């Protein structure tokens, strides 16, 4: 039986730039990188138990992707990302609870270097 999502993969156009972006702005730690053949390069980053796999394959593009990170300091995190110049896609707003045990929560969406959308909730 399934237990959890093991990792999320994002295809990027510049692996080094994207590794630095996720380390600097979101606190991910780059822990492994390798070539998988045919020019495919893969970098793995961790944030707690969450694994982000960044892939780069020359000539391929990515479209229509987002993932969500939870933060315990929503306003402070949003302020820091805006101060650092990370592109704001959708301003902070309230959203409904998606599960009975939850209250509503705040969300915001920022843009990554290749157009991926990074949602924050808190």
Regions found by a protein language model. Name each.
Residues 31-63, 111, 117-122:
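Conserved short beta-strand elements that form part of the metal-binding/catalytic scaffold
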Residues 4-13, 43-46, 59-122:
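Vicinal oxygen chelate
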Residues 20-21, 80, 114:
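Structural preference for long, well-ordered alpha-helical segments within the folded cores
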Residues 49-51, 58, 73, 92-94, ...:
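Short, flexible active-site-adjacent loop segments at beta-strand->alpha-helix junctions, enriched
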Residues 2, 9-51:
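Core segments of cupin and vicinal oxygen chelate
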Residues 22, 58-59, 99, 109:
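A general structural signal for stabilizing positions within well-ordered secondary structure
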């Amino acid at each position: 039986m399934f237990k959890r999502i093991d990792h999320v993969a994002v295809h990027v156009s510049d692996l080094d730039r994207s590794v630095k972006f996720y380390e600097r702005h979101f606190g991910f730690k780059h822990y492994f990188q390798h070539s998988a053949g045919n020019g495919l390069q893969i970098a793995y980053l961790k944030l707690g138990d969450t694994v982000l796999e960044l892939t780069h394959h020359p000539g391929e593009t990515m479209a229509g992707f987002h993932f969500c990170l939870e933060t315990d300091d929503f306003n402070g995190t949003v302020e820091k990302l805006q101060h650092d110049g990370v592109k704001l896609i959708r301003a902070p707003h309230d959203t409904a609870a998606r599960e009975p045990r939850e209250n509503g929560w705040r969300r915001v969406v920022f843009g990554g270097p290749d157009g991926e959308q990074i949602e924050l909730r808190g």
